[in-house]
C-alpha cells in the first residue's frame, strides 16, 4: 500500500543474534534494582512477570552482564549500519494480534513456544538496543479482525524524520479502507 510512496524500498533486517539474551539480562538486572525489595517482601502479591524478571536478574552473574553488553553493542552497530543505508525501517509494531488483558503474555507464535514471557515483544524491543527513534501507527485490522500497527524506525536523534514519515504515511493509510485506523464501536463496548 505505501511502498509506492517511497523512492525505493528493500526487504531486510539487521542481524540481531543474541538480542533476546541481551535484552533479558539487562531487563532482569533493571528489575532487581527497581523491584527486588518489593519482590522479597510481597512476592505473592505481584504479577508473575515482575517476579520472573527479578528472579531472572538475580540468577545472572557479572560475566552474563558483560556478555550481554557485548551482544547489545554488536546489535546497536548492526542497526546503525542499516540506518546508514536506509532512512527508515517500517515493520509490524507487534508479533501477535491483541490478546485478552487477563492473559499475562503470549506463550506461542505460529506453533513456536516462547522461551520467556517477553519474547513475543522482540520486534519492539530489539530496535531499542540501538536507541532507535520510533513511532507506532495504526494500520487497519489483521486477519483476526483486531487492530494492527506498524512501527517506523530510524537512527537515534532522527525523531523529526520519523515524525514526518509517520504523518505522511498516516495520510496514505487513512485513504485506504484496508489500512485506515479502526474506530471502535463504543456502543458495543458499553453494552
Give, region by region, the residue ranges found by the protein language model.
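Short helix-loop capping/hinge segments that flank enzyme active sites or metal/cofactor-binding pockets
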Residues: 9-13, 24-77, 92, 96, ...
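Flexible, glycine/charged-enriched surface loops at secondary-structure junctions
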Residues: 2-13, 176-183
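Structural helix-boundary/capping segments
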Residues: 56-70, 77, 85, 128-191
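Short, active-site-adjacent cap segments at secondary-structure transitions
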Residues: 16-18, 96-99
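Hydrophobic alpha-helical segments in the ANL/AMP-binding
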Residues: 117-130
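Tryptophan-centric aromatic hotspots in well-structured domains and transmembrane helices
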Residues: 52, 76, 105, 120-121
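Short, Asp-centered acidic motifs that coordinate Mg2+ and/or phosphate
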Residues: 88
